[in-house]
Amino acid sequence: LTYHLTSSNFNGKLNATKTAASSDGNTGGNTFNGVTTITNASAGYFGFGFSLPDTWNGDVTFTNSGSDRILPAWNVPGNLFNGNITLNSTGSSAGIHFCGGATATATLAATKSINTGTYDKGYLILQRFTQLGSAAVNLNLATGSNYLTLGPLTTFGGNFTTVAPSINN
């Protein structure tokens, strides 16, 4: 299954699983109002916010079990996460990479947190990611994962705890 999500509103629960081998870089401009689950189970990347910022108003879980990456808030400034973020990277995953474009930014709302569930494969990169408020952040990358990279321009407002095979900044 291939996805092309552009300037759409999702008012209920969304569960999107990518299985096609092609890479999907979604334009963006989407508003996700309900609980959202994004899964990449393919050999291509699954990206968001390539030309327009996305707004995630509910909790979101990103799970990568395919051999490429999930790319949230990839290329433009102004991506908003107004719910909690949970990250999973398993199977043959290359990892999850936030804000890869030179001007991309993501902001996590006050009282919300970004945490890991099962993260035993691939890397986690958080660039130009800002957490408002003081909610605790726990990122646990188990043995078998590659590394955690923070920055440039990444800010956490709360207590930050991480365990990872390698930590870069």
Outline where the language-model segments fall:
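Extracellular beta-strand-rich, repetitive "passenger/adhesive" scaffolds
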Residues: L1-T31, V35-T55, T61-L80, T86-N169
